[in-house]
Amino acid sequence: MKYCLKYTNICTKLNKADEISIKYIEDKGLVDFMEKFSSQRIILRVEATYFPESEIRKLIAIKKTYPDYRFAVAMGGYVQELGRTLREAGIDFFESTPCTDWERFNYLIKEGVSDINLSGPLAFDLGNVHRVLNILNPTVQVRVTPNSCMRLNPNTDPLIGFFIRPEDVEVYEGLVDVLEFEGLEHQDTFYSIYAEQKMFIGNLNQCIYGFNKPIDNKGLISLFGERRKTCGQQCLKGGLCHRCYDLASLAKPMGDRAREKILETIKAEQEKVKSSEN
């Protein structure tokens, strides 16, 4: 698993990151920055929709010396002029906004993005994402933001939103390539929790942005992440799976018998899901 940290003056773990993300500003010491972090990939965040030809020529020249950089472009769902200009110049780029549906996923891959930023339903269907990428372009990197709970309606239960607990990072190995954190001022903290400690003691709403529900993280067992990576959000499709809710119930203080009963329910649920898939 690779880790991308957003650059700030207060971030002390930049040298440990595989990638460093920084807002792109023309003629603002880009070469010096790349030289300082020459062993890491640089992600240049840009909101512009157009670069003058002189800027493109400069970027092409920089790439000869520092080839491992790419642009994260705010495209609004479509590859606008800037994206096509970068592609034609041989400069890697991807969309900064998370992709959540298959139509947009296929569109972006065919437009030549180097990475694809996932959330929503696609992030619950990573087995199929991996399969399709192997067909369309296996070099594309999958990126996610693990510490942000994304869902359309913030008032719905956060358990239906996509996020990854620090304890579940290993579960996503081979399906996700890069983790990039929300929270500009707390990049050090999240790198420590996810990459070094690989655990968090406390309520999930203390480490996951947008998770507005107090669930004791240490009470969740490993089945939580294992199922979510490929569940396809069956709970929203009238399916039989409600494992997230059952496992969250286990995180609450309860007697041994109550815990056994919930585990029995989960096991029975697993058998129903397996039989429905056969």
Q: Where are the model-predicted features located?
A:
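Active-site pocket-lining/capping segments in soluble small-molecule metabolic enzymes
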Residues: M1-N278
